Amino acid sequence: MERRARRPRGRFYAFRRGRWNHLKRLRRRYKFRHRRRQRYRRRAFRKAFHNPRPGTYSVRLPNPQSTMTIRFQGVIFLTEGLILPKNSTAGGYADHMYGARVAKISVNLKEFLLASMNLTYVSKLGGPIAGELIADGSKSEAAENWPNCCVPLDNNVPSATPSAWWRWALMMMQPTDSCRFFNHPKQMTLQDMGRMFGGWHLFRHIETRFQLLATKNEGSFSPVASLLSQGEYLTRRDDVKYSSDHQNRWRKGGQPMTGGIAYATGKMRPDEQQYPAMPPDPPIITSTTAQGTQVRCMNSTQAWWSWDTYMSFATLTALGAQWSFPPGQRSVSRRSFNHHKARGAGDPKGQRWHTLVPLGTETITDSYMGAPASELDTNFFTLYVAQGTNKSQQYKFGTATYALKEPVMKSDSWAVVRVQSVWQLGNRQRPYPWDVNWANSTMYWGTQP
């Protein structure tokens, strides 16, 4: 039975599992006065359409022997996409490629670590470089070891999608590791992250705060809508690179409130989350007689598209997303920011412990660090962002679009996000070397006693 103690001003304390827990108790006269108003609050109305936190249940897991708190603080720039020079694109279709101002920020420890890593050519775009590197082209010896000297293998493959938010972020991490840059000059893999933490495990995600501000004015009406969702609740799929085997990779289309109700292996009908970027194959006409006006038909292999899909501005607004107006459409103040706060584990399964390094493996390799062996890339929350406009394509559902630009020595950001995140690592190993086992087992080579 837990001990309870009363404190002044209506505070309530309970001693449970080795610590004092503070619970807020509203005064009696306050509760009954505002009981009728709480039923029709704005937040309760929005939760009827989309509940950002479906809830968790507590699991009786032991507290760690020792803990270490990790804090992240930084800024994320949501920029417009770029395209390679037009003379290097196949067929000259670069003049007809458009992108949408959408983004998706996943809250997981892996991407937060990538956001605080070295700012190099393949891991980040822009920003200061932590150290003096050689960047004189691919003819030097450093091109084989330093990532900022490498050139893309194929100039037709996109380097990143808006889901890789950590590429355009500058994040500080506390506590810092002064030897991380020299040990890992390139982008860290799951194997390197597991070795950096050693025997620590991810005990819980404490809190993450987002403050989003629209920075680009697009016409007379261009607010930025942002919605925070728990886990992978509304994620259609993650970003993948283009490959010739795209037809054999299955796609999940059964997310709530989007129109997708089944599983498909290829051509799905576009809804408010997927724009018709992959046109269907034209019908095969066997007759040689001219039928009407001759037009140029393109099949699915002659068009460029992306599997990475996002929520449109209209969908986010219908789910109760917040709006942030850019400067010029509204005076800049604290209310100009969209504030989002994510607390707790955010895992509907209720588990608190997460594996950083798989147990029972002596040598850590990439195969062991892949899901579900390692949970560094477990998404606790997801922030969906889209900018609206009064003039947009019909299948974009009010989302602002733009023509892809060639790479220039500056980036054009349409939103800025301030981030603060707190994580806690735990150690389950007993730190007492004088403990003994109740029974010892011995084994001889070749025989079993």
Curated annotation (Swiss-Prot):
Q: What is its main location?
A: host cell
Q: Note down the stretches annotated as region DNA-binding.
A: 1-43
Q: Where is this region: Nuclear localization signals?
A: 6-47
A single GO cellular-component term from the record reads: host cell
Q: Does the keyword DNA-binding apply?
A: yes
The lineage's top-level taxon is Viruses
What switches on its expression?
VP1 and VP2 are detected 12 hours post infection, while VP3 only after 24 hours.
**What are the UniProt keywords, alphabetically?**
Capsid protein, DNA-binding, Host nucleus, Host-virus interaction, Late protein, T=1 icosahedral capsid protein, Viral attachment to host cell, Viral penetration into host cytoplasm, Viral penetration into host nucleus, Virion, Virus endocytosis by host, Virus entry into host cell
Q: Which GO terms describe its molecular function?
A: DNA binding
Q: Which GO terms describe its biological process?
A: endocytosis involved in viral entry into host cell; viral penetration into host nucleus; virion attachment to host cell
**Location of this chain's protein in the cell:** Host nucleus; Virion
Assembly description: Homomultimer (Potential). Interacts with Rep; this interaction relocates Rep into the nucleus.
Name the protein family. Answer: Belongs to the gyrovirus capsid protein family.
Tell me, in a sentence or two, what this protein's role is: Self-assembles to form the virion icosahedral capsid with a T=1 symmetry. This very small capsid (25 nm in diameter) allows the virus to be very stable in the environment and resistant to some disinfectants, including detergents. Essential for the initial attachment to host receptors. After attachment, the virus is endocytosed and traffics to the nucleus. The capsid protein binds and transports the viral genome and Rep across the nuclear envelope.
Please report the name of this protein according to its UniProt entry: Capsid protein
Q: Which organism is it from?
A: Chicken anemia virus (isolate Japan 82-2)
**What is this protein's gene name?**
VP1
